[in-house]
């Protein structure tokens, strides 16, 4: 797969190990507004082309797939440019910040006959796929209830101003619920019919959502409760064996150091400037990547309650507590991080298997994120997406 990268920011930096280790992938082009990032890309990939804008990148005949890792508010326009140029698109979550944007993106994909896949999301993770396989086997009866929780330091990592502005896709709902709700939807296998939510906005200096809790009901009778906090107090990696979200083993750390580090940054200057200093082409390159994690990625503690068992996926194993019996299946080390994303993209393009994480799928996840932000008005669930639905219903061929 010949990939052109649009946006050389943090999302790209997290995907870079995947691109480098997947033999099916060739990075052939990049575009960004930062000349230092483009210079670093050219140094890391001498045979690749660099472009000052997405329009010129999409005219490059070597580009087969466009990976979009730009800020959330630009996802829609960048995806439309790429799709209209006849490129397949892999766009980071959230797909966009409005349902109308999602609608236009899906319509472009259908007209172009190209695939629009949204990821990385933690619903791609192997432990989640394995849990779904156990559910689908019917061995433990139907899913009845799902519990998901994650306590992190998300809100106190250095941020640009837009990342603390909900209207521009900032805050933990657009950034983190888009992971958590994707996982819940994949496992529940129903359509959401009711949501009750509570939002936490507890820091006047960071005036966006830092936490949420919600009860979600599906049309097949499944109920799920989800809780997330990014306020950098309790670290729920404790219940994941001190394996962090990226699958890296961490020292036992009862308290996050993130708030203290942010105070140090703010005392010296701008957190946006500090974050920029750690970006690709400044603090990062393809030759200075950390060692590969030895576990699968995860998104916190998850319990799937079926009629005959509780299923608990973790980063290194999956546990089943079934009517007095305990089963444990250890996972082998992943070949490379986020392999599942590239497998789905490759299988779609090659015609091997239709994708799961299409634009339509991601649009429904965004609909649920918006429901959380609006307080879960039950009469709106599923109706917003219908009201702005595209004439076409397929994200690609």
From Swiss-Prot:
Record SUPFAM superfamilies: Glyceraldehyde-3-phosphate dehydrogenase-like, C-terminal domain, NAD(P)-binding Rossmann-fold domains
Organism this protein belongs to: Comamonas testosteroni (Pseudomonas testosteroni)
Assigned EC number: 1.-.-.-
Transmembrane segments: none
PANTHER family, per database record: BCDNA.GH03377
GO biological process, one term: catabolic process
Top-tier EC class: oxidoreductase
Gene designation per UniProt: cbaC
Signal sequence bounds: none
The entry's keywords: Aromatic hydrocarbons catabolism, Oxidoreductase
Protein name: 1-carboxy-3-chloro-3,4-dihydroxycyclo hexa-1,5-diene dehydrogenase
Family the UniProt entry places it in: To P.putida PHT4.
Gene Ontology MF, one: nucleotide binding
InterPro entries in UniProt: Gfo/Idh/MocA-like_OxRdtase_N (IPR000683), Gfo/Idh/MocA_oxidrdct_glycsds (IPR050463), GFO_IDH_MocA-like_dom (IPR055170), NAD(P)-bd_dom_sf (IPR036291)
Any Pfam family: GFO_IDH_MocA_C3
Domain of life from the UniProt record: Bacteria
């Amino acid at each position: 797969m010949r990939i052109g990268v649009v946006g050389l920011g943090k999302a790209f930096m997290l995907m870079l190990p995947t691109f480098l280790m997947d033999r099916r992938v060739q990075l052939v082009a990049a575009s960004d507004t930062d000349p230092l990032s483009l210079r670093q890309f050219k140094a890391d990939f001498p045979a690749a082309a660099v472009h000052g804008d997405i329009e010129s990148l999409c005219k490059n005949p070597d580009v087969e797939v466009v990976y979009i890792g730009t800020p959330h508010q630009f996802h829609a326009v960048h995806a439309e440019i790429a799709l209209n140029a006849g490129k397949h698109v892999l766009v980071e979550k959230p797909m966009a910040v409005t349902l109308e944007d999602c609608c236009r993106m899906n319509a472009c994909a259908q007209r172009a006959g190209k695939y629009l896949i949204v990821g990385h999301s933690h619903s791609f993770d192997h432990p989640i796929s394995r849990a779904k396989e156990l559910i689908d086997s019917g061995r433990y009866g139907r899913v009845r209830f799902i519990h998901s929780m994650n306590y992190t330091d998300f809100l106190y990592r250095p941020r640009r101003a837009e990342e603390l502005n909900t209207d521009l896709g900032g805050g933990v709902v657009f950034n983190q619920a888009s992971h958590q709700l994707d996982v819940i939807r994949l496992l529940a296998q129903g359509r959401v019919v009711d949501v009750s939510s509570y939002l936490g906005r507890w820091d006047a200096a960071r005036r966006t959502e830092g936490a949420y809790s919600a009860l979600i009901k599906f049309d097949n009778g499944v109920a799920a409760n989800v809780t997330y906090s990014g306020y950098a107090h309790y670290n729920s990696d404790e219940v994941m064996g001190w394996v962090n979200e990226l699958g890296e083993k961490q020292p036992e750390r009862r308290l996050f150091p993130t708030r203290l580090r942010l105070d140090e940054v703010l005392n010296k200057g701008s957190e946006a400037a500090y974050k920029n200093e750690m970006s690709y082409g400044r603090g990062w390159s393809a030759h200075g990547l950390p060692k590969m994690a030895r576990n699968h990625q995860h998104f916190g503690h998850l319990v799937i309650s079926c009629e005959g068992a509780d299923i608990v996926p973790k980063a290194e194993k999956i546990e089943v507590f079934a009517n007095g019996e305990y089963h444990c299946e250890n996972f082998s080390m992943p070949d490379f991080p986020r392999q599942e994303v590239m497998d789905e993209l490759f299988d779609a393009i090659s015609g091997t298997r239709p994708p799961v994480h299409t634009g339509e799928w991601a649009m429904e996840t965004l609909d649920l994120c918006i429901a959380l932000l609006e307080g879960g008005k039950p009469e709106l669930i599923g109706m917003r997406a219908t009201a702005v639905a595209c004439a076409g219903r397929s994200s690609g061929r």
